[in-house]
Amino acid sequence: MKFVSIKIYTAVVFFLFFNVFQMCAQTFVSNKTKEDDLYAGIDVGSKGVKLSIIQMGKNASVTGSFIALKYKSVNNDFIYFTPSTFAATVKGMSSLYKFAISDFKIAPEKIFTVISSGIKGQAERENKMDHIKALMDSFKLSIQDPERNVPVIDAMGEARLSHLGIVPEARRYNTFLIDIGSGNTKGGYFKNGNTKELKLFMLNWGTKTIANATEKRMDEDKTLPNYKKQLNRVLAGDPDKEIVYAVNESGAYNMNDNFAFSGGIAWAVATMLYPELSENSVVPLNFDDLNKFNDRLASNYASLTPELISKSVIDKTLNKAEIALEIGRVQKVFDQRALMAGTSLLLNIVRQFEGTQEKKHFFLVKNGQVGWISAYVSQSVNNMY
């Protein structure tokens, strides 16, 4: 893959934006830790269960600062609401809970467990809220803690927490954050310098729900060309209508200069599309690059192996083996069709913000998966004191 050079004006904006992110407390660092300062957040999402280990910063009860030390996930596709995915999710939740206790010596009362808005939305659409209640009960039984609180968060709450957990304070009021999850997409921006007043951006579509809708349309023809055709049809239907409405209703175009995208697909695209920025947790996104990458996923996926992408890296100071390893991780989480679904959704959203009169700046946040759950833990800890 030939690395696409970043234009000078984009590089300057990226440098400023990226440096603020790097100085932000919510980044991964190697640090001496005290067990008393450690907390854990377990997030049950559409695709799997995720664990974030958080170290609260100095004066955290006042500032809310934190450091995300460890991230671990287990994929189990709870969103299918089948007996097998149900059992796998309970097992995943329990194993991550026990991992936090055994490996990090975190007390049970410092472990917070939350059901994400993507699960909630899909369960409501399929009339499967009883599955969520059963999941909570089974998890409590598994860890022998019948009184544990396992709240179900809504899209507004998750979007607000994502912004607080991902976007540094210096960019908080001119950045529109969009988190593309497995089950839905949510985000927004804070109005009038008030972190309690989020202008919500919400879609009932995420990487997994787009892929599922595409699979349902394929009938007997399971070929890749048919998948691509049906994917385009899915995106041209309700998702496109929701995107256009959500963008126009948000008023974000005139109110924000920076548009940051987080979620698993943001990490995947950033890792595969910009391998020379492998050491950066935030990378700039060029619309034309994204469009070409989206086409390549369907037409020439064989050229996107970890080995071939890493070999294309020109900078000799970078570790190509590590780059290939990270791309391999991406492709274990997202197969070709999942990448096509998620990237196409990302492309359709970016297209709506790609203006002709006023140039906007787009960014991909790689470690955004710890964002909202980290902010939830931080907020919960603050409320304890």
Regions found by a protein language model. Give the residues of each.
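Bacterial Sec-dependent N-terminal signal peptides
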Residues: M1-F28
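Short, glycine/charged-enriched secondary-structure capping and boundary segments
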Residues: A25, M56, N127-D130, F190-G193, ...
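N-terminal glycine/serine-rich phosphate-binding loop of ATP-dependent small-molecule kinases
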Residues: Q26-L38, V49-K50, M56-S117, K133, ...
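Gly/Thr-rich phosphate-binding beta-strand-loop-beta motif of the actin/hexokinase/Hsp70
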Residues: S30-T63, I166-K199, L203, G264
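Extended hydrophobic secondary-structure segments that form protein cores and membrane-embedded regions
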Residues: A40-G41, Y71, F112-S116, P151-I153, ...
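Short glycine-rich, Thr/Ser-proximal phosphate-binding strand/loop in the N-terminal lobe
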Residues: K47-S84, G193-K228
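Helical "lid/coupling" subdomains associated with nucleotide-phosphate turnover
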Residues: F81-S94, G121-H131, K140-Y173, K199, ...
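Residues at the starts of beta-strands that form the adenosine-phosphate
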Residues: A107-I111, N174, N258
